[in-house]
Amino acid sequence: MKNSVLECRELTKKYGKKEVLHSLNLKLEQGKIYGLIGRNGAGKTTLLSLLSAQNPGTQGEILLDGQKVWENQEALKHIYFSREINPNSTVYSGLKVKELLKIAAAYLPDWDKEMANSLIHLFHLDIKKRISKLSKGMTSMITIILALASKAEFTFLDEPVAGLDVVAREQFYRILLEEFTESGRTFVVSTHIIEEAADLFEEVIFLHEGEILLKENTQDLLEQCRYVSGKTEDVERAVQGKETHGKEVLGRSQGVMVRLKPGEKMEHTEQVTLQPMSLQKIFVSLCSGEDETI
C-alpha cells in the first residue's frame, strides 16, 4: 500500500453524557512520524483506539483510502495500535511475555519475528517472565516491540517511553527513526516527553479537551512562534495586530507568544526581546486559554 491516507470525519466519542472527542477532522498521510500531544484526559488514547477500530465512535466515520475501517478486516491489516499494558489487568493474568508475543505473531499478518527477537535482545527482556511481574519500563518495552515488529503501515504508540530510563528512551528513538527511514511506515506517537522526542516529529497534532488545536509541520510551527517580552506597553505595541497566546504578566513586565501568519514578520526593536520557543512552550501557551489579536 502506497500513499495511503487514514482519516476521520466529524468524529465524536461520548461515554454516557461526557463527550471525550468533539467533531474531529484529521487526515494522516503515509510516510510521516506524527507527534500526538495533549494533557492527561485530552482524548489521545481514545482517539488512537477509535482510529484503530478498537473502540467504536459515537458519530462520524474513519476511512482508510476511502473505505470504512470499522469491522473491515482488510483495512485493519494495515493499522496497529500498541496501547499501554496494565500488568494487573485480567487480560494478562498468568500470561508470560513469550506467550503474548506468540499471540501477536499469530494475529498480526506482517509480524517480523527477526525484528522482535532483535529488540528483545537489545532491551535485555526476559520473555519467560509473567507480565504481571514486570515493571512499568518493561511493559513499555513490550509495547515498543509489538508496535515495531507489527510492520503495520499505520502504527500508533501511546506513551511508549513511560518508565524507561534515558538510555532505553534514546534506543527507542533511534530504532523508530531507522525503521521509519527503511520502511516509510506512518507512526503516531503520543507522549508527554515533548522536547526529547520533538526532533522525530515531521508533524505535530495538539489535542486539547477533545478538540484538535492544530496539526502543523513541526519546523514550520517553530518558525512561526516567538516569545515577546519586555515592559507591558512596549510588548503590547510590538504585538499589535498579531495572533497572541499565553500572556504572562509580572509587575510592569509582560511576555506573550506570537504566532505569525505565512509571510508575516515581527519587527525587531530595542524595547522588547524576541526569543524562539520550544515545542513544549508553544503547546503550553496554546492551551493557556489566551487566544486573541491585540
Where do the language-model regions lie?
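Conserved ABC transporter NBD signature motif
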Residues: 59-71
